[in-house]
């Protein structure tokens, strides 16, 4: 197979470079014929199940499997489901003919979903549901043949990584695989399937992955694993997951994809639009997004996200900095492809959103996850999304379960599935790496249609105004001098910005300190202006006031959403230079202000350091530094340690930014060092 792949690449190269030879054509034809013979199986599956690939076909696929199993009973494969969640794996294995005798789930709302679907006549009828912490779960079960489940994966996820590294097995949730292993040891099944996020393989330099493999192998199981994309198996959603199959005896190969470029017949992906064509929604269709960013969704082309509004994409009003948000922020699904991964949790602007510029309904999300229309989901909208987003798509689970049924238990299945050799390389990662260029082209096509006058950012503004900052860090402007706490005199033009903050009524106090910001030569937002922020207030709180008022004016006049969108996410290269100067020389003798100055200028910022290292860097004792950093956190600086972010080890500190970033919506504002 490998040599034929090489032949294909050689033939493909010849075709691309217009060196069309008879040998190249013959090689290409030979490879395609070989590939189809070895890897194509889904068309035969449709024929065997007597279904067609129309909207909602995964439901009919599952129903046809159940019907076939009723007429062709297999031996009783007693299966235990752990971390069952909303039941995605349970549905897939049940439909494939496994007997799910018991399911364990700790969250009552999720267990209630399972209970609803185990009633007489429901899909999982006959399964016993145990709502209990797995640490306290001691099942009294005999002759368990197989175990399925995936422990909670948040500690290995992209969100966990972005919070300041990946917790992995340093977090209690990351160690739940030990309980999984405990039950395998207790029940001694013939095999198991373990599902998790793919990042687990590289988390913490591979240490957790090595621990997981060692734990299972020590129990006497040989592991077969791959990172697979659910869209390759008929799910209208790009969803990469690590799948481990552990066996006491025998061997296992994963199935060839049924859909996409890696399938034997190059079958089209099951698109989001096709999946939703026949969905029946309830009357509770979500309205268009509201809030400060909701209106932005309307103009985002399908398939793109917040990055449409970045300077990198060429947008004339770049609200956001490149890579300053998660990839699902304001992500609008493309109807002609699978959607990106549906997440269990997220904020108001977490996608995917419909191409109709609204959130998807629960019924639509069920289709995008291939949950049966008839499957009951307990709870309100957010609870339902939590369950769906945490689940293995049932259609993906069906294909895996059938593959296990055939290879591990030697049972007949209604059609032949073709299995990949262990060294066969899938191409979804390579295709994913090319998407940035595709998105850029799509963005350019939309941006080229925007009238040049749309950028209404101010080119010259000079004004005086009264402000107030509430205790929750919310800025209020346009006040009377009696209502206000601060008087602001500012001038914004193409060469210089000057913003002076003082106390009412007329702001004639002497300047105490100033901050000079030098934009990079590539800046197109501030028009290369030098920015001078000055404060005539020397109270410790004034550093927050100065930055917050600058941020407010930036958003009002230059359409940047916040300081991070201007200066960039802390893990990326810094392009703006900050300098702080004390006009009031007494500030130089104050450790609080010396620490603020160093942080402003980027010293000790953006890296995780020990308390001792920062104490030396800032020239103060650990006790005093703790007090200063706590004050700065109260004043809006995002200071992180183990108490605020479990990903950070005890005794370590992270100051992500040189300026205060917390606002009235920040949960970090409520945490304490």
Pin down the residues of each PLM region.
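Core alpha/beta nucleotide-donor-binding catalytic domains of modification enzymes
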Residues: 44, 49-188, 198-210, 217
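A structural signal for well-ordered alpha-helical segments within the folded catalytic domains
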Residues: 87, 108, 178, 206-210, ...
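C-terminal target-recognition/interaction regions appended to catalytic cores
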Residues: 1-59, 65-70, 299-673
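Extracellular structured ligand-interaction cores
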Residues: 76, 239-241, 337-339
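Short phosphate-binding/catalytic loops that engage adenosine nucleotides
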Residues: 98, 221, 637
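Class I S-adenosyl-L-methionine
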Residues: 137-146, 156-331
């Amino acid at each position: 197979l490998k040599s034929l792949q090489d032949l294909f690449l050689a033939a493909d190269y010849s075709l691309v470079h217009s060196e069309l030879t008879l040998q190249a054509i013959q090689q290409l034809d030979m490879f395609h014929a070989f590939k189809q013979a070895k890897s194509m199986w889904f068309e035969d599956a449709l024929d065997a199940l007597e279904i067609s690939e129309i909207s909602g076909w995964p439901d009919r696929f599952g129903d046809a499997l159940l019907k076939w199993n009723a007429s062709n009973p297999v031996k009783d494969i007693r299966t235990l489901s752990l971390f069952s969640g909303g039941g995605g794996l349970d549905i897939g294995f049940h439909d494939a003919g496994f007997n799910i005798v018991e399911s364990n789930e700790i969250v009552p709302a999720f267990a209630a979903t399972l209970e609803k679907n185990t009633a007489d006549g429901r899909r999982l009828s006959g399964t016993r549901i145990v709502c209990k912490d797995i640490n306290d779960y001691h099942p009294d079960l005999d002759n368990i043949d197989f175990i399925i489940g995936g422990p909670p994966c948040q500690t290995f996820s992209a969100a966990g990584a972005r919070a300041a590294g990946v917790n992995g097995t340093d977090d209690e949730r990351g160690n739940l695989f030990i309980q999984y292993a405990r039950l395998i040891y207790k029940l001694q099944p013939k095999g198991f399937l373990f599902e998790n996020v793919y990042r687990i393989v590289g988390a913490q330099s591979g240490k957790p992955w090595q621990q997981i493999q060692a734990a299972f192998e020590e129990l006497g199981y040989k592991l077969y694993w791959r990172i697979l994309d659910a869209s390759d198996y008929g799910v209208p959603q790009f969803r990469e997951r690590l799948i481990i199959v552990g066996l006491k005896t025998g061997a296992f190969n994963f199935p060839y994809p049924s859909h996409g470029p890696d399938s034997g017949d190059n079958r089209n992906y099951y698109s989001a639009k096709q999946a939703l064509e026949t969905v029946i929604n309830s009357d509770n269709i979500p309205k268009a997004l509201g809030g400060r960013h909701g209106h932005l969704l309307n103009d985002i082309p399908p398939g793109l996200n917040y990055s449409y509004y970045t300077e990198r994409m060429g947008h004339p009003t770049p609200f956001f900095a490149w890579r300053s948000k998660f990839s699902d922020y304001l992500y609008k699904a493309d109807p002609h492809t699978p959607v990106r991964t549906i997440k269990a949790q997220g904020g108001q602007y977490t996608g995917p959103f419909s191409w109709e510029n609204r959130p998807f309904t629960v019924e639509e999300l069920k289709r995008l996850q291939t949950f049966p229309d008839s499957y009951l989901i307990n709870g309100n909208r957010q609870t339902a999304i939590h369950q769906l987003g945490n689940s293995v798509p049932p259609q993906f689970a069906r294909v895996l379960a059938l593959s296990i049924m055939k290879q591990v238990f030697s049972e007949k299945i209604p059609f032949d599935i073709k299995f990949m050799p262990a060294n066969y390389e899938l191409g979804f990662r390579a295709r994913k790496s090319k998407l940035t260029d595709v998105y850029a082209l799509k963005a350019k096509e939309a941006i080229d249609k925007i009238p040049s006058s749309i950028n209404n950012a101010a080119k010259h503004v000079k004004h005086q105004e009264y402000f107030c900052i509430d205790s929750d860090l919310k800025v209020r402007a346009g006040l009377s001098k009696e209502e206000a706490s601060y008087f602001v005199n500012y001038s914004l033009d193409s060469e210089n910005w000057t913003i002076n903050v003082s106390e009412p009524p007329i702001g004639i106090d002497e300047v105490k300190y100033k901050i000079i910001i030098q934009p990079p030569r590539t800046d197109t937002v501030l028009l290369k202006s030098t920015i001078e922020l000055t404060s005539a207030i020397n109270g410790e709180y004034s550093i927050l006031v100065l930055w917050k008022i600058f941020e407010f004016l930036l958003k009002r006049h230059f359409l940047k959403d916040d300081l991070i969108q201007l200066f960039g996410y802390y893990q990326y290269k810094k392009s703006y230079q900050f300098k702080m100067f004390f006009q009031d020389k007494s500030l130089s003798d104050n450790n609080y202000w010396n620490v603020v100055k160093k942080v402003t200028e980027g010293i000790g910022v953006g890296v995780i350091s020990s308390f001792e290292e920062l104490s030396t860097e800032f020239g103060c004792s650990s006790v005093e530094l703790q007090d200063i950093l706590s004050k700065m956190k109260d004043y809006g600086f995002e200071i992180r340690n183990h108490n605020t972010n479990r990903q950070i080890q005890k005794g370590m500190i992270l100051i992500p930014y040189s300026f205060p970033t917390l606002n009235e919506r920040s949960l970090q504002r409520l945490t304490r060092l």
